């Protein structure tokens, strides 16, 4: 039993690390906004389970990896700096600080200032005095929730705009069915083909994916 304890502890540590990695991917990258927008579009189309959840999550993950590639590369370059020795806890702390800087800049770039001010001021009411003494608006504890809420807000703004043309189709179809005395026919059955035709005609998936990617354009980029 004693011989197995190190292996069990290592397994627990790896599992915990993977869990934290998943949490970081969801809360500090484009994954939240992209996935929410994709699911809102599916709901607006009225196709319910088409595309399947796994397809939408895969698409969201791929777009997230594409958008986050510069941050990942900068982080890798910093933590593999030959000047970092990794021989003491101070060395590891220095590497963690250097490696987190690109992510910190990414969060600051796409975080709403109002949210940052709210969470910073909330520390005075929620956190004990010793914890809030040195906190700033650029700390991860402030940036991560601010970024998450900012991304959710932008996702629902995009979803609202995407919903409008499909709602118009629903209203038109419902009105026509009522005028024809076909109130027993579900408008959804008739509206979905027209929604799909409109979405395909305007190359909806390409435009949607392109728009989501370009919403993370670097300042000053063409």
Swiss-Prot record:
Record's InterPro entries?
T3SS_IM_P, T3SS_YscR-like
Its cellular-component GO annotations read: plasma membrane
**Which coarse location class describes where this protein primarily resides?**
membrane
Which cellular compartments is it found in?
Cell membrane
> Sorted alphabetically, which keywords does the UniProt record give?
Cell membrane, Membrane, Plasmid, Transmembrane, Transmembrane helix, Transport
Q: Which residues cross the membrane?
A: 6-26, 52-72, 158-178, 182-202
Name one process (GO BP) from the record.
protein secretion
Q: Does the keyword Amino-acid biosynthesis apply?
A: no
Q: Provide the topology term for how it sits in the membrane.
A: Multi-pass membrane protein
| A Pfam family it matches | FliP
Kindly indicate where the leader peptide sits in this chain: none
User: What is this protein's function per UniProt?
Assistant: Could be involved in the secretion of an unknown factor.
Describe the family membership recorded for this protein in Swiss-Prot or TrEMBL: Belongs to the FliP/MopC/SpaP family.
The protein's name is: Probable translocation protein y4yL
The organism named in the record is: Sinorhizobium fredii (strain NBRC 101917 / NGR234)
What does the record give as the organism's lineage? Bacteria, Pseudomonadati, Pseudomonadota, Alphaproteobacteria, Hyphomicrobiales
């Amino acid at each position: 039993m004693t011989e197995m304890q190190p292996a069990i502890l290592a397994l627990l540590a790896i599992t915990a690390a993977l869990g934290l990695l998943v949490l970081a991917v969801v809360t500090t990258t484009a994954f939240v906004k992209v996935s929410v927008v994709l699911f809102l579009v599916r709901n607006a189309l009225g196709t319910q389970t088409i595309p399947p959840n796994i397809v939408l999550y895969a698409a969201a993950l791929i777009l997230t990896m594409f958008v986050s590639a510069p941050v990942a590369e900068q982080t890798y370059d910093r933590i593999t700096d030959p000047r970092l020795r990794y021989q003491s806890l101070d060395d590891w702390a220095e590497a963690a600080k250097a490696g987190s800087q690109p992510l910190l800049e990414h969060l600051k770039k796409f975080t709403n200032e109002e949210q940052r001010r709210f969470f910073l001021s909330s520390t005075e009411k929620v956190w004990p005095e010793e914890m809030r003494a040195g906190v700033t608006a650029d700390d991860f504890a402030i940036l991560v929730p601010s970024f998450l809420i900012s991304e959710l807000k932008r996702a629902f703004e995009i979803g609202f705009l995407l919903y409008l043309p499909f709602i118009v189709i629903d209203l038109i179809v419902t009105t026509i069915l009522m005028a024809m005395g076909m109130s027993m026919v579900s408008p959804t059955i008739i509206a979905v083909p027209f929604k799909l035709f409109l979405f395909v005609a305007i190359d909806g998936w390409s435009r949607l994916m392109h728009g989501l990617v370009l919403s993370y354009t670097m300042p000053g980029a063409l």
